[in-house]
Each structure stands twice: as C-alpha cells, then as structure tokens.
Swiss-Prot record:
Listed PANTHER family: SUGAR FERMENTATION STIMULATION PROTEIN A
One function term, GO molecular function aspect: DNA binding
Stretches that traverse the bilayer: none
Organism of derivation: Cyanothece sp. (strain PCC 7425 / ATCC 29141)
Protein name stated in the entry: Sugar fermentation stimulation protein homolog
Protein family according to the UniProt entry: Belongs to the SfsA family.
HAMAP family: SfsA
Domain of life: Bacteria
Amino acid sequence: MAEWIYQYPPLLAGTLLQRYKRFFADIELESGEVITAHCPNTGPMTGISTPGSRVQVSRSNNPNRKLAYTWEMIQVEDTEPTWVGVNTGLPNQVTKLVLAAHLIPELGDYDQIRFEVPYGSEKSRVDFLLTGSDRPPTYVEVKSTTWTKGQLALFPDTVTTRGQKHIRELMALLPAHQAVMLYFINRGDCHQFAPGESADPVYAQLLRTAVAAGLQVLPCRFEITPEGICYLGLADLVL
C-alpha cells in the first residue's frame, strides 16, 4: 500500500444505528455505549448509511461542541469490504496535501498553491489555483464522491445546480487558462469514474461538453482506512 498522505487521530469503532435529519447519526460503540455523532455529510449518502454497518468516529475535546463525536467513515460490502469516507470536510484537506507533495504528475509543474480564489462571472471561489513561471494558471475544483455501481464511481448522486455552475465557470476560463475538475473518490474499490447521468443528466452533459472544450478531468482514487488515507492514482474516465 502507498504511504499515508493523511493520518487520522485515534478513532473509535462502532455500529451505525441510524442517520437522521442529515446531520445526526446514532452509533453504538464497541463498549456498548450509544452516542449521537455529527454527520459531516449533507448529501443523500446513497448506499453508505445502512444501519448495522461498521463505522469509525473521532472524538473532540472541545467543550464548546454540542456533539463531541464526528462520524468519519463506514464499511460497505459492495464488491469487497471497503471503508468509505463520510466526512466531506476532509477531501479538500487531503487534496491540499497531495498537491503540496506533487503526487499528481498530470498537473505538471507548479510553484505556488493558492486556496479559495474568487473567479468567474457567477462569483465562485475555486478550491485551488496552481501557478508557475512557465505555465498558465491552473484552476482546480474538487468534488468528493462515494456513490458507486460495482467498481464505477459516480458523481453527482443528486441534482447539483452548484456543481453545474462550477463546470460552466471552469469552461469560461478556457483556453486562456487551464481548468481541472478533480473528483476525490472517497473509497479504494473503484477503478473507473463516470458522471452520474441518472442522478443529474444536465450535469453529465455539461461535463462532456466541458471535456470536449478542454477541461481536464482527474478522477483520483483514495484508500480509506481507520489509520489514514493514501493516494492510489487515477481511475479510468468513462464518458
């Protein structure tokens, strides 16, 4: 296995009892204690919120938090037992580490990484802007995905007008700048990636149009374990 690019703090194992109101999850820890954890994922979590599944949670020592525990990952049994990242706050953090370590050769050489840079007519903020002396600026937008069909990762898993907007704004940068859509595949069992046509056909068609116009798509595979996260390289793009 590749080296960890990110290491979790000590986690606690448990069993998912239920997820409700989007932000809450009742979990029975191995000790038998039942806790309510914060669910840091507002999406539908298609296929990754089944009661009875094994989960891992982190615990905060911040006395001001209403919920001390955060649900970090869940184990699914789709094609093989696989840990799937639940915490949508992590992909951008991990991507920042990957970019700083220059682990994605497809992005070429760059000297500086800027974060949350305003751009576009629709007033977005791009996740990362890569610059270098001998290259045009490269705008990188990150999207995390956990939805799969077999070993095919899919995004989005629901209609996303915000995601559609991001594609339009990245397209508007071309060809004067480089534009990249980086899909953070938050599980290690997928070897291909495709747009989630059945969930959002408008997004899927926009992505195909953008690729034809020069948008670079990087479906990045990550292995998730209770110890940490490692980068596995690119999945094959299926358009």
